Design a protein with these regions (language model features):
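Beta-rich carbohydrate-recognition and catalytic domains
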Residues: 1-2, 10-190, 196-244, 252-256, ...
């Protein structure tokens, strides 16, 4: 079965958006490929052409496909089997120290990396890989840089108790093994968020607890913790929804924080909602 999956958008200039998406055969018969296509805000039309996104590793520059991502990680000791699909621009895009930063991920392969997007906005370059402990099957991370320069990523876990794991790095290249932290407990296997707005970090995570009316464990509760230093955290928001509240994205525009979130019965994604956080 084929799919166009996991869209991401970045603004190129006042008139143009660049839209990224993965095109994949989820049966694994061929390598998936990430593409981009530009959208003209003046004419409200897409360019007639689509283009392949490229991947730069220590070994060279290749099409952004899972086999090249896996080969780069294997050079650093990654031992999980290769997957032909599931490579996504997961956590994007953040401006940090003059660079456009993102986290990329192969979901079925439990593979993650910190990366940059080049100035031409057509090539992803890997900075460093974080995949340990392998038995936790880390995936779908969100990353930011703390005031002391340390990189911190919160990762979804697909094994064990499935609570979120945190990995850190001083240089973005060498990372610590993932560990749980006490301010995030009873986490569920769903994508987290980690943003910084006006000097405040916003860290969002899915909770696996049952909600008040007795519905079962699922993506019904989403918490947002805030911190100025990335060390001391406090709860700012708790969203509860019978029909799920999952995979939100938060963005700041004109002094306000906006969000888009998916919702649906039984944890599916029947609709997308848009709103103002603060």
């Amino acid at each position: 079965t084929g799919a166009c999956f996991v869209p991401r958008i970045i603004r190129l200039d006042d008139h143009t958006l660049r839209c990224f998406f993965a095109c994949e055969d989820q049966g694994g018969r061929r390598q998936s490929q990430t593409w981009y296509r530009d959208f003209d805000l003046r004419t409200r039309t897409f360019s007639p052409n689509i283009h392949r996104v490229r991947l730069r590793t220590a070994e060279g520059t290749f099409d952004l496909q899972p086999n090249h991502f896996h080969a780069a990680a294997a050079k650093h000791g990654f031992k999980q089997p290769a997957k032909a699909f599931g490579l996504y621009l997961l956590d994007s895009f953040k401006q940090i120290d003059g660079r456009t930063i993102l986290a990329i991920n192969n979901f079925p392969g439990a593979q993650n990396a910190l990366a940059t997007l080049n100035e031409a906005r057509d090539t992803i370059e890997i900075i460093g890989h974080y995949n340990e402990p392998a038995e936790a099957r880390l995936t779908e991370s969100s990353v930011n840089r703390l005031p002391d320069g340390t990189w911190l990523a919160i990762c979804r876990s697909e094994s064990g108790n499935r609570n979120y794991r945190f990995v850190t790095s001083k240089d973005g290249r060498t990372w610590s093994p993932g560990e749980e932290r006490p301010f995030v407990s009873k986490g569920s296997n769903s994508k987290p968020t980690f943003d910084k707005f006006d000097g405040v970090y916003y860290l969002g995570w899915q909770e696996a607890s049952r909600i008040v009316d007795g519905h079962g464990v699922g993506r019904y509760i989403f918490n947002v913790e805030v911190s100025r230093d990335g060390v001391t955290w406090e709860r700012k928001y708790r969203f509860e929804a019978i029909e799920s509240f999952q995979y939100p994205t938060f963005r700041q525009h004109d002094g306000s924080i906006w969000f888009a979130v998916t919702q649906g019965k039984g944890g599916s994604t029947d609709r997308i909602m848009f709103g103002k956080l603060e």
